[in-house]
């Protein structure tokens, strides 16, 4: 039998190829106690971009480990569903800078309606607003004054 560390390594290697036949393994792995396994499986589900995984990715976006949350946000970006957009917007308020940045870039890359971005920019969370502003500046090559 293969231990969880090795499974995670293998999943990380094959995930970009989008093999749907491993979907069940990925789904089950998102509930693992092993952080590396959760990260690998959430990323793998993101590569599959199956709307059926929306709930799983939204749940992973609230994981205790920031790397899992960040991977979930990138997966939600690929879904682009209304719930995924809302999940990405919520992640701009994450306590971890890296997750806020991933969410900000994901929100912009999702080609959402400008009102979705304005919601974050005009919201009460300064850090969320700053993350989106920074991502906007970077995505259109504007210079900050």
Descriptions of predicted regions:
Residues 4-5, 35-36, 51, 66-67, ...:
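Alpha-helix N-cap/helix-start positions at coil->helix boundaries
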Residues 13-16, 44-47, 75-78, 106-109, ...:
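Core register positions within helices of long alpha-helical scaffolds
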């Amino acid at each position: 039998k293969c231990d969880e560390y090795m499974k995670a390594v293998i999943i990380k290697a094959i995930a970009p190829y989008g093999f749907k036949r491993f979907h069940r393994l990925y789904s089950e792995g998102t509930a693992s106690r092993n952080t590396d396994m959760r990260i690998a499986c959430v990323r793998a589900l993101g590569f599959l971009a199956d709307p059926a995984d929306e709930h799983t990715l939204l749940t992973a976006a609230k994981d205790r480990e920031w790397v899992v949350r960040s991977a979930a946000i990138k997966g939600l970006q690929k879904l682009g569903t209304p719930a995924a957009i809302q999940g990405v917007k919520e992640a701009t308020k994450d306590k971890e800078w890296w997750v806020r940045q991933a969410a900000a870039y994901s929100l912009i890359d999702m080609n959402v309606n400008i009102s979705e971005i304005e919601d974050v920019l005009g919201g009460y969370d300064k850090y969320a607003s700053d993350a989106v502003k920074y991502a906007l500046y970077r995505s259109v090559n504007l210079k900050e004054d």
